[in-house]
Structure formats: C-alpha cells, structure tokens
Amino acid sequence: MGTARFLSAVLLLSVLLMVTFPALLSAEYHDGRVDICSLPSDSGDCLRFFEMWYFDGTTCTKFVYGGYGGNDNRFPTEKACMKRCAKA
C-alpha cells in the first residue's frame, strides 16, 4: 500500500510540473518576479463556472474559471484586469 501511495504522489507531482512549467517558461519576468499579465489564461482544475477576466497581451478577455488552481492572470472584472495589466 505504501508503494501505491508513493507512486500516486509522484504521478500527481509530475502532472503538476507538466502543467506549471510551460506557463512559467512563457511568462515574462521583471525584477526577478513573474509578470502575471504575461501568463496564459488558465481555467484551473475544478468544474465550477465563474466568469473571470485575463490579460491576453493586448486587452482583457473574458474566460471561464473552474474555481480552483490556475494562475494569477485572473481578475473578477474587466476594470480590475485593465487597471493591473494595461500599459498607459
């Protein structure tokens, strides 16, 4: 039973790394920190339905968020998204 749990944990960690690592590679960094506005949209892991906004590099776009997980390029309103990500 211990081996099965270990393998399950390794599998889960592998999946999380496969999902997270490409997003981090595509992100832009400023002062050593990830620019959240450069992250891709990420609907998360759950199956709930929340209308949210993400910055697509040009403007804020509506998407469906599942309620858990995802990344920080997620805003409750278009106004909040534009305030954080739109360049003047």
From Swiss-Prot:
Residues the UniProt record annotates as site (May bind Kv1): 39
**For this UniProt entry, which segments traverse the membrane?**
none
* Signal sequence bounds: 1-27
Q: Which InterPro entries match?
A: Kunitz_BPTI (IPR002223), Kunitz_BPTI_sf (IPR036880), Serpin_venom_toxin (IPR051388)
> Any S-S bridges, and between which cysteines?
37-85, 60-81
What are its GO biological-process terms?
envenomation resulting in negative regulation of voltage-gated potassium channel activity in another organism
Report keywords, A-Z: Disulfide bond, Protease inhibitor, Secreted, Serine protease inhibitor, Signal
In terms of SMART domains, this protein maps to: KU
Prodomain residues: 28-33
KW Secreted (keyword) present: yes
Q: Where is this site: Reactive bond for chymotrypsin?
A: 47-48
| A single MF term (Gene Ontology) | serine-type endopeptidase inhibitor activity
Query: Predominant location of this chain?
Result: secreted
The family database entries (Pfam families) matched by this protein are listed as:
Kunitz_BPTI
The terms describing its cellular component in GO are: extracellular region
The residues covered by the BPTI/Kunitz inhibitor domain are 37-85
Any keyword Magnesium?
no
Q: Where in the cell is it found?
A: Secreted
Q: Where is it made, tissue-wise?
A: Expressed by the venom gland.
Free-text function comment from the UniProt entry: Serine protease inhibitor that inhibits trypsin at a molar ratio of 1:1.
Similarity comment text for this entry: Belongs to the venom Kunitz-type family. 03 (sub-Kunitz) subfamily.
Can you name this protein? Kunitz-type U15-theraphotoxin-Hs1a
Tell me the lineage of the source organism.
Eukaryota, Metazoa, Ecdysozoa, Arthropoda, Chelicerata
